[in-house]
């Protein structure tokens, strides 16, 4: 990557407009993409949804328009020990000039894309609220207008942050979000980062990142603290690399983050300026800290020594059982010391303080001793288990284990007509590769609801899908719809990255010719002051507890050559660039080790299962598509009925044929070719035909789909004269015939012959 391109500062600008007559205030951020033009993000308040706590209409250029509102309940929620923030994205189909395709012709449950947008908003927005808030807060983003070539999700991050800034809620400064695409072309062979890429730019991007952050003070200067990253390689990145384009590696991520910061800064400045001019006064809300300082001190004194020993138990279940039992003992011992609190509140505070003490012990030992709960070093990976071909009738299956995390991967192949049709406001209309992730409650030894996927499951499935998508073969090379299911059977740290590994194994087992195998690893980071100096320790292959106790977790997936997906969330106000670089290198080493272990079991596609459909393709002239389909689908349906094969026709004339056996597929191909790529029959050729129609003067016999001939009544009786055609043959009868003549108009005359 070009350091020059990464460090060049865009010429962004922010301006404000106030219309006193209508009570409308605007903030306009103009973002400079250099040779790729500019994008304009406009925030407007005062016209729509005036009764909401905070309301902002956000525009991307002219045609994409979102309404964001933030509203809080008047009273805190009783019995809640967490902040009840909900984020909803409402896709209105009128935004794209469409009527919903559902039976009732109105919007129903949110699309997958809307749910993923909710998660993108929630992750950076939630940490900005003051700790201890228990009033219910609801952020609703409604898509009112949508340019069909644009994406609204990152615009929604900014809109949700802006409406929250105006709402009078106790929050820190605004959050800015930007999608960055690395585009390499003849003019920019090493790539240029482009903010808010449209769909055309998205499809040719080498790498793409959604980055959210906020402005923090670093001395006298403003800096941007990165809060969240979602990243992935372009769909065609493998081919682009072969053509000479730069591979997206660890340095690409660092450069992309730096390139995003000026855009985030401009977006935050626009929101802050809007808030200065139009925000409500911050209201007083009751806060409920998880525990008092006196409670923490008492628990620390009573429990820390024994906790240090209990936290060395390597097994998750044994460790959890031991610490939970000890927590009950500590609670029983201390609860009477806090008679100024009611019993329920005292119990809650003691338990929260116990967990906080446990967290501090783990963090301190990591920083000072390099100690981890299960005894590993900071760069060690847990024991790996790899197996394929577990499920008898599945087209491909695998089991991937990393410590106590256990993922079952299952692959199903089908015809292209089974690819998912997407009815949402994104430019993507269909998906050939579908990745579904399930996280049942028993995976953590608990009970709970099962059934339709929760937001977390949808998000994890999307991350794993993004990790695999760059290595999925093209539809021309592998004309199948692919459904990959990841079943989290056991969970103790990063089931999403375990799903990536299990999917590679399962896809190979199903015979899918991946461009390269992909593995994923979850990383953590712990920071703190040791001997007067700030220290950062990156952890490889984090446990669930290390995820909860750490300052940052990021998941990295990729091949041995390039990164395919990355997800990062941090609680820190900025990560030093050298710390992030070292952590990414540590992740690459772990990824390589996992790929080596996987390759010992399977390193290339197996033969396809005999239970998987056989799909072949043939190309026909576009002007023959109608003839192949036939009136009301008559011809194509006849091919399906006669051969047992399914036939799917693409707009470019590619015909995909799926059948249970090779013989059925060959028969269907012959039928298709006889219609669309015909070779005229010759006099003397014999066919076993089907009588399709009888008339007074003879019987019409189908030789091949779309090509019939006539047996005259005089030829049906042999040497005998017959009065009625139906005395000899009826519709549906099979009859052996020979072509006697073909006239100038192509009409075929047939005569019955004895079967050979």
Curated annotation (Swiss-Prot):
GO BP: mRNA catabolic process; RNA processing
Coiled-coil ranges (or none): none
Top EC class of this enzyme: transferase
Record field: catalytic activity: RNA(n+1) + phosphate = RNA(n) + a ribonucleoside 5'-diphosphate
Location in the cell: Cytoplasm
Pfam families: KH_1, PNPase, RNase_PH, S1
Family of this protein: Belongs to the polyribonucleotide nucleotidyltransferase family.
This protein's name: Polyribonucleotide nucleotidyltransferase
Gene: pnp
């Amino acid at each position: 990557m070009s350091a020059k391109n990464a460090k060049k500062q865009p010429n962004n600008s922010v301006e404000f407009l106030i219309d006193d007559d209508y009570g409308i205030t605007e903030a306009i951020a103009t973002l400079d993409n250099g040779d790729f033009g500019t994008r304009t993000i406009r925030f407007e308040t005062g016209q729509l949804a005036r009764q909401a706590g905070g309301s902002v209409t956000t525009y991307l250029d002219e045609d994409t328009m979102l309404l964001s509102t933030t509203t809080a309940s008047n009273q805190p929620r009783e019995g809640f020990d967490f902040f009840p923030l909900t984020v909803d994205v409402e896709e209105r189909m009128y935004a794209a000039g469409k009527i919903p395709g559902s039976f009732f012709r109105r919007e129903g449950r949110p699309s997958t894309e809307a749910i993923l947008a909710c998660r993108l908003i929630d992750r950076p927005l939630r940490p900005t609220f003051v700790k201890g808030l228990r009033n219910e807060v609801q952020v609703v983003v409604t898509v009112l207008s949508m340019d069909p070539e644009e994406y609204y999700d990152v615009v929604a991050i900014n809109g949700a942050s802006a409406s929250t800034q105006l709402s009078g809620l106790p929050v820190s400064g605004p959050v800015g979000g930007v999608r960055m695409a690395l585009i390499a072309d003849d003019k920019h062979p090493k790539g240029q980062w482009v903010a808010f890429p449209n769909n055309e730019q998205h499809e040719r991007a080498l790498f793409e990142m959604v980055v959210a952050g906020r402005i923090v003070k670093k001395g006298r200067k403003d800096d941007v603290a990165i809060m969240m990253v979602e990243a992935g390689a372009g769909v065609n990145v493998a081919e682009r690399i072969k053509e000479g384009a730069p591979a997206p590696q660890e340095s690409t991520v660092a450069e992309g983050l730096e390139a995003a910061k000026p855009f985030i800064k401009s977006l935050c400045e626009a929101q802050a300026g809007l808030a200065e001019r139009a925000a409500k006064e911050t209201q007083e809300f009751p806060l409920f800290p998880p525990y008092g300082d006196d409670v923490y001190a008492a628990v620390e004194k009573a429990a820390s020594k024994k906790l240090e020993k209990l936290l060395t138990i390597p097994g998750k279940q044994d460790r959890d059982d031991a610490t939970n039992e000890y927590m009950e003992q500590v609670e029983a011992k201390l609860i009477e010391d806090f008679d100024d609190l009611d019993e329920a509140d005292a119990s809650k505070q003691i338990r929260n303080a116990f967990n906080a003490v446990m967290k501090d012990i783990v963090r301190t030992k990591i920083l000072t001793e390099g100690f981890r709960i299960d005894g590993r070093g900071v760069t060690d990976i847990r024991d790996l288990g790899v197996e394929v071909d577990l499920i008898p009738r599945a087209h491909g299956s695998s089991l991937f284990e990393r410590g106590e995390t256990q993922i079952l991967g299952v692959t199903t192949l089908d015809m292209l007509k089974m690819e998912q049709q997407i009815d949402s406001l994104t430019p993507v209309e269909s998906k050939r590769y579908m990745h579904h992730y399930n996280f049942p409650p028993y995976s953590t030894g608990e009970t709970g609801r099962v059934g339709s996927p929760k937001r977390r499951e949808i998000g994890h499935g999307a991350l794993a899908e993004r990790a695999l998508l760059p290595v999925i073969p093209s539809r021309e090379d592998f004309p199948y719809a692919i459904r990959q299911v990841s079943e989290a059977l056991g969970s103790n740290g990063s089931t999403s990255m375990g799903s990536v590994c299990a999917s590679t194994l399962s896809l190979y087992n199903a015979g899918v010719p991946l461009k390269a195998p992909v593995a994923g690893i979850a990383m953590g980071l712990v920071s703190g002051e040791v001997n007067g100096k700030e220290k950062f320790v990156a952890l490889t292959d984090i446990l669930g507890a290390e995820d909860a106790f750490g300052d940052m977790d990021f998941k990295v997936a990729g091949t041995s050559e390039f990164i395919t997906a990355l997800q990062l969330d941090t609680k820190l106000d900025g990560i030093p660039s050298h710390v992030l670089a070292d952590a990414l290198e540590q992740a690459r080493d772990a990824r390589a080790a996992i790929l080596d272990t996987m390759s010992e079991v399977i390193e290339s596609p197996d033969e396809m299962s005999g239970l998987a459909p056989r799909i072949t393709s043939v190309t026909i002239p576009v002007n023959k598509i109608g003839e192949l389909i036939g009136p009301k689908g008559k011809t194509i349906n006849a091919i399906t009925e006669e051969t047992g094969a399914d036939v799917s026709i693409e707009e470019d004339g590619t015909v995909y044929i799926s059948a249970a056996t090779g013989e059925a597929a060959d028969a269907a191909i012959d039928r298709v070719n006889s219609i669309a790529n015909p070779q005229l029959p010759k006099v003397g050729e014999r066919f076993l035909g089907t009588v399709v129609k009888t008339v007074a003067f003879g019987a019409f016999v189908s030789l091949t789909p779309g090509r019939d001939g006539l047996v005259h009544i005089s030829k049906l009786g042999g040497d005998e004269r017959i009065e009625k055609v139906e005395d000899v043959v009826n519709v549906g009868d099979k009859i052996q015939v020979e072509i006697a003549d073909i006239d100038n108009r192509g009409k075929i005359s047939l005569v019955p012959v004895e079967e050979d």
